[in-house]
Design a protein with these regions (language model features):
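N-terminal secretory signal peptides that target proteins for export/translocation
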Residues: 1-3
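Sec-dependent signal peptide hydrophobic core
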Residues: 5-13
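A charge-rich, low-complexity, intrinsically flexible signal that marks solvent-exposed coils, linkers
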Residues: 22-220
């Protein structure tokens, strides 16, 4: 009887290990779409990995990207990757500007440091400039509400407080209904940092990393 119980226990442990092994690939595959689109022998973009290392403050980055068309990629660190949206009109400090944000594939955390030119023939070929970067806080958490960034993302309503070089204050990403699965709206929320009198894209075109503009980066 004792031997039978020991065997049963061993089988349970083995089944548990197999189950854990089966579940693990789903987590490892989060960046599969990102990697499958790129030839890392030709592009300097980081191959990257999921990075769930606990940081004191989560990061964000906005990268100006002149690919098939000019746009701004807004990326938020959530669950070890950069959740990403392409914003054709870019960010604004005016709360009345509701800009389309098209969700794209998850990027590795290392991508927040990437600035350079993606070679011709590669996915997203063209110059990429770090337009702004910094840290952010979960606005709901700041208000004392118990809802995680991952849950806000799943619910299609993200509210964050950005602390960047150019952008500061509360911003929202809201998933739209009836406009397509990957379409969101990105906008400045009303607070003391809102400013409807300026066009931040035109007044601050330079990279916060190198000081270059998208045109000078292309020439280099």
């Amino acid at each position: 009887m004792k031997q039978a119980l020991m065997k049963a226990g061993s089988v349970a442990v083995i089944i548990g290990c197999i189950g854990a092994y089966i579940m693990a690939p789903a987590e490892r595959d989060v960046l599969e779409s990102y990697r499958s689109k790129r030839d890392f022998d030709k592009t300097n973009e980081p191959k990257g990995k999921i990075d769930k290392k606990k940081r004191e403050e989560a990061i964000f980055v906005i990268q100006q990207h002149d690919a098939s068309s000019m746009h701004y990629d807004f990326r938020l660190e959530i669950d070890g990757v950069l959740k990403s949206w392409a914003i054709p009109k870019g960010p604004s400090t005016n709360p009345h500007d509701k800009h389309l944000a098209i969700e794209t594939e998850d990027h590795p955390i290392e991508y927040a440091e990437f600035e350079g030119v993606i070679p011709e023939g590669q996915y997203g070929a063209g110059p990429v400039l770090i337009w702004d970067t910094g840290t952010y806080e979960d606005l709901k958490e700041m208000q004392g509400k118990d809802i995680s960034m991952a849950d806000m993302y799943k619910n299609g309503k993200i509210e964050v407080f950005l602390r960047g070089t150019k952008l500061e204050g509360a911003y929202a990403l809201i998933k739209t209904k009836g406009m397509g699965e990957n379409k969101w709206l990105f906008f400045k929320m009303n607070d003391e940092y809102a400013d409807s009198s300026k066009n931040i894209i035109k007044s601050r075109p330079e990279s916060v990393k190198s000081g270059k503009t998208i045109d000078s980066l292309r020439i280099d």
